[in-house]
Amino acid sequence: MKLKASHILLSHKDANPPTHTRGIALAMNVAEQLISEIKSGGLSFEQAARENSACPSKERGGDLGWFEEEAMVIEFSAACKNIQKDDIGPPCISPFGVHIIMRTG
């Protein structure tokens, strides 16, 4: 199945690789705050990605483009499939960190 999404990756000290000193609980808290700001219109998803994401996709506002679900870790693909197009799902935890996912296709 092909999916299209944008995401914000929030790293934490137990992620692979551990590129941040915060714990997973704080990363989840930051994710919830960002989702709230984005949904209230106070911050665009693209701006939040550029300012907060640990993924190189931040340069594209978090845009991952189209991908086969098998190309992503199972946690990410499963979460993405449960999000309606143009919506943002709840924070998703994977070995890479905490993801904020917006399904775009």
Question: Locations of the language-model features?
Answer:
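Well-structured core secondary-structure elements of compact alpha/beta domains
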Residues: M1-S40, P56-A71, I101-G105
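Glycine-centered tight-turn and secondary-structure capping sites
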Residues: G41-E46, D86
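Short, well-ordered alpha-helical segments enriched in acidic and aromatic residues
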Residues: F45-A54
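Short acidic-hydrophobic surface loop/beta-edge motif
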Residues: I88-S94
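Signal for well-folded cores of large energy- and translation-related assemblies
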Residues: K39, S53, K81-Q84
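Phosphate-coordinating loops and pocket residues in cytosolic domains that bind phosphorylated ligands
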Residues: L10, R50, N82
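Cell-wall glycan
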Residues: S6-H7, I74-K85
